Amino acid sequence: VTNPQHDTRIDFIYLSEPEMIEAGVGDLAKCVETMEETLILLARGDYRMAGASGNSHGAQINFPDNPEHEGMPANGPDRRFMAMPAYIGGRFRTTGVKWYGSNVENRKRDLPRSIHLFILNDSDTGAPLAVMSANTLSAYRTGAVPGVGVKHLAVENAETVGIIGPGVMSRTIFSASLTQRPTIKNLKIKGRSAGSTERAAQWFREKFPEVNVEVVETEQEAIEGSDIIIGGTSTSPDGPSGFPYFKTEWLKPGALVLAPAAARFDDDFVTSDARLVVDFKGLYAEWFNENGPDVTYEQLLGIPGNRWWDMVQEGTLKESDLANIGDIADGLVQGRTNDEEIFFYSIGGMPVEDVSWATDLYENAVSKGIGTKLNLWDVPELS
């Protein structure tokens, strides 16, 4: 029986994509600050994600290559559905889940490859606080997490950035990098096709007229002389031979490589000279546990942190060779000590990042009266 003294009404707000923009989803300087807080909370342990260890990236639905049932989708590149739930503590103390479907064929319909929705919940009652259009939420937090690496690991006077794979992810990463290193004045771009690369270059020129933008023909040209290198190429069906290759000899002393996607490094350099940083070690450990030792990083995602965790299991790296960016930001682990060190920063992406940024945007929306209020119930029918 419902206690008449209790207010049982539950309302939540819906935020469309234009309303998310109005609420500040694209404020990358602020988003970098929020991601830094989030990564510190991760390193301190004030979070929960899915899975046995609380570190899972999420739960994924894949499809068979040749479905036996009419209407069932068939497997294809980036063809999946995924739910990514998490709780984040600190000043946030909220819980949420990002849910998305992905299909490269969407491009033919003038739609994004993946379409995202986010639900933010009260961590005490479980009641929904907000339902959000989440493509921009996901894109900007994805750019801001590498931005935390730029803040703590890039040389102070960084001037030149090289991009391999100038898609949406690389654009938001570059935008976030500029908030942390306004000294950047040169950008080199290497893409897969001339047409899409030139379109990307034009986007950068219009967005950042103060930056000199150059299209280059090879990965080597994009890497050589760059203070910051962004690898934004999705996993190749050709395996490692199709991944961007960051050859040791091409890397400028002091370079920072941001690797949120498939990338290939020289193992001997990784084990001897490079400084290795990850967004969170627990994520890569859980990926390894979920997929088993027979699924190598090449088959999984191609993200360098997966390869480094394989090497930890092989004994060619020690776990202590990997540093959490949150521990560096928290002052517990030494960051850059000189302008010669080369850093590799692997970013896998985690739902805690969506939850924290969504919480900030929800609070902005409420304070500004943005969004549509929807009612779940006044009094629950079943209680």
Q: Model regions: which residues?
A:
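N-terminal ligand-binding/catalytic initiation module
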Residues: 1-139, 145-147, 157, 352-355, ...
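Adenosine-phosphate binding glycine-rich loop
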Residues: 17-25, 263-264, 268-381
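Short internal alpha-helix immediately C-terminal to a glycine-rich phosphate-binding loop
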Residues: 141-162, 168-182
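NAD(P)-binding Rossmann-fold cofactor-contacting core
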Residues: 180-207
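Short, conserved loop/helix-junction motifs that constitute active-site signature segments
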Residues: 181-182, 245-253, 268-272
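Rossmann-fold NAD(P) dinucleotide-binding segment
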Residues: 224-225, 236-256
